[in-house]
Amino acid sequence: MTDALMIERYYAILDSGRIDDAVALLDESIEFAIALPGTVRRGYNRSDMLDYLRGRPPVDRRHVLLRTSSAGDVQFAYGSVVENDVKTTGYFLAAMHLDSDGAIDAYEVSFDTEFSILTKELAHGKRD
């Protein structure tokens, strides 16, 4: 995974259940906004993110990255969230900023249970 984008590494580690290892990729003073249906969770440090991640309901959840990109010190991902390797519960768009040491110092994600920008493509089973 040495050539993987940090955003790919972050989701892979998070989905493996290693929450502490995922949070270790974050700068201590990370700022984040996580927009979920009906609410936005904001935080201002690594501890806030750890509290959020540990507070999520226990479920076999996986982020399937359908698109990734980077532009300088900002990385992007678009994908679906799949539970129990069967049910797609929604789609997300995420962006993160990396500091000069490569740590994630800002993170923003939005999640929608219905809308996908790739609806037509997914309906035809196409994927890059």
Tell where the protein language model's regions lie, with residue ranges:
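Short, aromatic-enriched amphipathic alpha-helices that serve as compact interaction elements
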Residues: 1-18, 25
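Soluble or luminal CAZymes and related metallo-dependent hydrolases
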Residues: 2, 6, 48, 88
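Residues within well-formed alpha-helices
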Residues: 9, 21, 76-78
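A solvent-exposed, acidic/Ser-Thr-rich amphipathic alpha-helical stretch
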Residues: 19-21, 27-71
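A beta-strand edge to alpha-helix "cap/lid" segment located at domain peripheries
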Residues: 50-128
